[in-house]
């Protein structure tokens, strides 16, 4: 942890945004946490904890709540956006007039732009311009464990090496939180989106009862799909062997804390898409991500058979066992 204290605004008071705000405040930094619903924000401020998502973890004294988006964005030079991917562009559009001179914007949102499949970096440049330093945080992190202070490691990448190091210093804690700098801005973003899709597939596989062999094959070939797409877009293949690639993929595909995996499990056990989403009770990024990753792969001319079959299950009502047979029945080829 850096000995210097800073001030940071976190936009998004869901489980992950709250957890990041707690980690930053626990490191001694002044943190402003914004939430979309003013009544919910008032409750958070009164109870000094997020009873819905992280009920056993009190807020540090240096964490304050704010219900006004522009006021939150204007309050600190560093702004960390942790909203769902479908709200990302609109959130940036709203905060742009309020940002301080010299502001820096990072995000921990994992996904792609809805309906276009664009990287969030492209959305950020469109909404904020290319003069503002931008950064992304990604890696194998469940909010509850992170907020509890369990050992955690993530990656950070930025258009500015100085900003990347600043974020690493803000979050790093020798007891529990390690941050790795990575100069592959594209790869770090992409890993956080594609792993959601593969996690749904792993959940479906387990829900249907295919077993550990099938799950492991999905994870391994899913990593190959991620790497192919990433390289086609200019990412470095070694990025996908790190925290934001293999690390996040394993975590999301194998642990039932993952909403995307639980969503897939529910589908595999016979629930409809709508019922499965409702049963999760939180945003299931992978549902939208599947369509966006599929569009991006088609636009890039990259073969992603697992993603294609999951897309057909979710959006074309394809039978899950038929989708599995379509993968197994593909032409034999070298690994």
UniProtKB/Swiss-Prot annotation:
Broad class of enzyme this protein falls into: oxidoreductase
Pfam families linked to this entry: NAD_Gly3P_dh_C, NAD_Gly3P_dh_N
UniProt entry tagged with the keyword NADP: yes
Q: Which reaction does it catalyse?
A: sn-glycerol 3-phosphate + NAD(+) = dihydroxyacetone phosphate + NADH + H(+); sn-glycerol 3-phosphate + NADP(+) = dihydroxyacetone phosphate + NADPH + H(+)
InterPro entries named in the record: 6-PGluconate_DH-like_C_sf (IPR008927), 6PGD_dom2 (IPR013328), G3P_DH_NAD-dep (IPR006168), G3P_DH_NAD-dep_C (IPR006109), G3P_DH_NAD-dep_N (IPR011128), NAD(P)-bd_dom_sf (IPR036291)
Q: Which Enzyme Commission numbers does its entry carry?
A: 1.1.1.94
Query: What does the entry list as the binding residues for NADPH?
Result: 15-16, 36, 110, 143, 259, 283, 285
Q: Which domain of life is it from?
A: Bacteria
User: Which HAMAP family does this UniProt record tie to the protein?
Assistant: NAD_Glyc3P_dehydrog
The protein's name in its UniProt record = Glycerol-3-phosphate dehydrogenase [NAD(P)+]
UniProt source species:
Pseudoalteromonas translucida (strain TAC 125)
Question: Which gene underlies this protein?
Answer: gpsA
């Amino acid at each position: 942890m850096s000995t210097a204290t800073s001030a940071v605004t976190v936009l998004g008071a869901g489980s992950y945004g709250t957890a990041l705000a707690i980690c930053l405040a626990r490191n001694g930094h002044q943190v402003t946490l914004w939430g979309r619903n003013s009544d919910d924000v008032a409750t958070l401020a009164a109870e000094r904890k997020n009873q819905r998502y992280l009920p056993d973890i009190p807020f540090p004294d240096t964490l304050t709540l704010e219900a006004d988006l522009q006021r939150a964005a204007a309050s600190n030079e560093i702004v960390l956006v942790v909203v769902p991917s479908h709200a990302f562009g609109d959130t940036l559009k709203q905060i742009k007039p309020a940002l301080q001179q010299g502001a820096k914007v990072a995000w921990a949102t994992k996904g792609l732009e809805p309906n276009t499949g664009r990287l969030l970096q492209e959305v950020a440049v469109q909404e904020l311009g290319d003069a503002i330093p931008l950064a992304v945080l990604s890696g194998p992190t469940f909010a509850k464990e992170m907020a509890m202070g369990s050992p955690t490691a993530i990656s950070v990448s930025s258009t500015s090496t100085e900003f990347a190091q600043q974020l690493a210093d803000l979050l790093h804690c020798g007891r529990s939180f390690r941050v790795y700098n990575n100069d592959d801005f594209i790869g770090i973003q992409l890993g956080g989106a594609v792993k959601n899709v593969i996690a749904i597939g792993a959940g479906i596989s387990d829900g249907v009862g295919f077993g550990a062999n099938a799950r492991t094959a999905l994870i391994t070939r899913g990593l190959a799909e991620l790497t192919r797409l990433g390289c086609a877009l200019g990412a470095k293949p070694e990025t996908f062997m790190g925290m934001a690639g293999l690390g996040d993929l394993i975590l999301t595909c194998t642990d039932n804390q993952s909403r995307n995996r639980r969503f897939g499990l529910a589908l595999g056990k016979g629930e409809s898409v709508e019922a499965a989403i409702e049963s999760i009770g939180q945003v299931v990024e992978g549902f939208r991500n599947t369509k966006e990753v599929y569009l991006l792969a088609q636009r890039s001319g990259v073969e992603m058979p697992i993603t294609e079959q999951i897309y057909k299950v979710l959006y074309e009502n394809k039978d899950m066992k038929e989708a599995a047979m379509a993968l197994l029945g593909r032409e034999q080829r070298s690994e």
